[in-house]
């Protein structure tokens, strides 16, 4: 898939810049899990993303990625951000298994309901 036609979809793992950041927010070029649907992402050029870190701390809003993916670490569900994936030149690096995506959405629910 060429970058010009790429539209992130729920479950994709992308790499993009999280700068600028403030306080306890994740920063820098890093992988992230896309949680918003492709229809929204295409129409708005925005996507809801949860950053991924290689440093697990055992927090309740961390969801571990299984071994064997292009990216390892934990999804930081409570650090969800809405970012312009086109302007930040998001690059597809992998895909999370469906059970991981479901777990991320389940842990996100109490934060937004």
Language-model features: locations:
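Conserved functional hotspots at enzyme active or ligand-binding sites that engage polyanionic ligands
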Residues: 1-113
């Amino acid at each position: 898939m060429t970058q010009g036609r790429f539209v992130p979809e729920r479950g994709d793992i992308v790499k993009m810049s999280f700068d600028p950041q403030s306080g306890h927010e994740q920063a820098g070029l890093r992988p992230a899990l896309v949680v918003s649907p492709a229809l929204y992402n295409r129409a708005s050029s925005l996507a809801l993303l949860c950053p991924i870190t290689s440093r697990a701390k055992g927090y309740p809003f961390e969801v571990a990625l299984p071994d064997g993916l292009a990216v390892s670490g934990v999804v930081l569900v409570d650090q969800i951000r809405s970012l312009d994936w086109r302007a930040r030149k998001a690059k597809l690096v992998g895909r999370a298994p469906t059970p991981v995506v479901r777990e991320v959405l389940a842990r996100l629910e109490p934060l937004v309901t």
